[in-house]
Amino acid sequence: MEIVIRQTPSEVGTTVADIVEGYVRRGPTTLGLATGSSPLGSYRELARRHRESGLDFSDARAFLLDEYVGLPKSHGQSYFSVIRSEFVDHVNLDPGHVLSPDGESSDIAEEGARYDAAIAEAGGIDVQLLGIGTDGHIGFNEPGSALTSRTRVKTLTEQTRLDNARFFDSVDDVPHHVLTQGLGTISEARHLVMIAFGKGKAEAIAAAAEGPLSAFCPASVMQLHRHVTVVIDEAAASKLQLADYYRYALEHKPSWQSF
């Protein structure tokens, strides 16, 4: 695991965009896209590079981490619609090459297995972007999720539904269930890139990177992965015991070694 500490959230977004651009410029790439506030700066920077420098996403495809059960893709708050408005519609990534779990599937119990099979058929995910919750969750894998879990239906906590109610007309309109990639599914991506900033994420980052491997902190599953880059700002790094070493290692990173 490589931990990259930047001064500001803007620098975090630039570094993550650098990583994604490296993959895209090397050829056909399968991206794992996350929603939420953490990757927004990275998406904006990638869109700017497409607009101003011609960064080409025409050979890329993408898979989303999760989707609400019961919402059509056309709904403004479906994660498919959100990722289009936040990123896909601002670059030349074919929306037909962007896949999400089907929250309207006629066999919702089997949709997770179908989605995992679609990822495998595409050759797997090259680089997966991830946020992290204050409780260490990634995707909708809340504390207690099995570290080897697959894409499946999860029940939203009442607090999560209340938190998301601001995006809907009322809390009654917020779905009770989501389809989310499991921790085992996420771990099969070849490169995991976690994004976090702000003091509110400091304890979760410390638990994920330096704490015990535990279902209590789902993001700690990254400790078992062979290629993880955690890109955070100084505030999110404030609880890391080895922060000075991470800064030292980055300062002396060989010029030939990419993220």
Swiss-Prot record:
Active site at D66, D135, H137, E142
Keywords, sorted A to Z = Carbohydrate metabolism, Hydrolase
Q: Name one GO cellular component term.
A: cytoplasm
The broad enzyme category this protein falls into is: hydrolase
The record's listing under PANTHER family reads:
GLUCOSAMINE-6-PHOSPHATE ISOMERASE
Q: What family is it from? A: Belongs to the glucosamine/galactosamine-6-phosphate isomerase family. NagB subfamily.
This protein is called what?
Answer: Glucosamine-6-phosphate deaminase
Q: Which organism is it from?
A: Rhodococcus opacus (strain B4)
Q: Which gene encodes it?
A: nagB
